[in-house]
């Protein structure tokens, strides 16, 4: 039922479709009522994992292992009412492997409003950290942005694009947020999601990128290690929304 409301569904009879729409409308009314009576919705966090699986299966060619790992990690994280770490996902590969598409799907199926949700923060080095000489200010701003938004809502998603272009040392400020401590800087961050996207531009012997094997994941980049491991730990940038 949840998948139907997000647009990924098998088509059935008209009668079945009308019944599905009616059921979805009733469920939406109930959810809206619960949202007004308490903290049921946890900000904009409304995960639709069946819809995500459906969309990945229909529109992401190859990368079978990657799809399985992402869905498995999300299921375990979402179903845990009290996770001990934030969810940290690393999406890395060559152009055309679906990294950006997968990250947009994750935002779409986890948060109402998708990338436009105020709880989804999309960082681009070109837009938000263009001058390496300003690294100390960037560190201060990034730490403040993450801390402030997690204080406002623990269910937040932080998406870092083009990690290979980030100023050296900037991501070190995130290390405290990616561990297993209960509180960092007075903020509970264990329900947050961090996604790191890295483009691999390594060329082969003939000046071309190595061929992509179906279901194969490229080797993980070297640093920063806590940020670039797919693990169960886990802005637009400071001053902007995704």
UniProtKB/Swiss-Prot annotation:
Residues 210-242 are annotated as: Disordered. Pfam families: Torsin (PF06309). One of its GO terms (molecular function) is ATP hydrolysis activity. The keyword Signal applies. Salusins -alpha and -beta may be endocrine and/or paracrine factors able to increase intracellular calcium concentrations and induce cell mitogenesis. Salusins may also be potent hypotensive peptides. Belongs to the ClpA/ClpB family. Torsin subfamily. This is Prosalusin. It comes from Homo sapiens. The gene is TOR2A.
């Amino acid at each position: 039922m949840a998948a139907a409301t997000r647009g990924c569904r098998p088509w059935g009879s008209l009668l079945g479709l009308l019944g599905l729409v009616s059921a979805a409308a009733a469920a939406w009314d109930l959810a809206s009522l619960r949202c007004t009576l308490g903290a049921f919705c946890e900000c904009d966090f409304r995960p639709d994992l069946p819809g995500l699986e459906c969309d990945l299966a229909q529109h992401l060619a190859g990368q079978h292992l990657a799809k399985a790992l992402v869905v498995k990690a999300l299921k375990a994280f979402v179903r845990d009412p009290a996770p001990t770490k934030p969810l940290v996902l690393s999406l890395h590969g060559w152009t055309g492997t679906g990294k950006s598409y997968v990250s947009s799907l994750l935002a779409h199926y986890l948060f109402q409003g998708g990338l436009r949700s105020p709880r989804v923060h999309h960082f681009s080095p070109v837009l938000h950290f263009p001058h390496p000489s300003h690294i100390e200010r960037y560190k201060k701003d990034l730490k403040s942005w993450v801390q402030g938004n997690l204080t406002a809502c623990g269910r937040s998603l932080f998406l870092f694009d083009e990690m290979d272009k980030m100023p050296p040392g900037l991501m070190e400020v995130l290390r405290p947020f990616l561990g297993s401590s209960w509180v960092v800087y007075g903020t509970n961050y264990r329900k947050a999601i961090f996604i790191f996207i890295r483009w691999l531009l390594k060329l082969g012997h003939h000046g071309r990128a190595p061929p992509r094997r179906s279901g194969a994941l490229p080797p993980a980049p070297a640093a920063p290690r806590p940020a670039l491991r797919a693990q169960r730990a886990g802005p637009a940038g400071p001053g902007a929304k995704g």
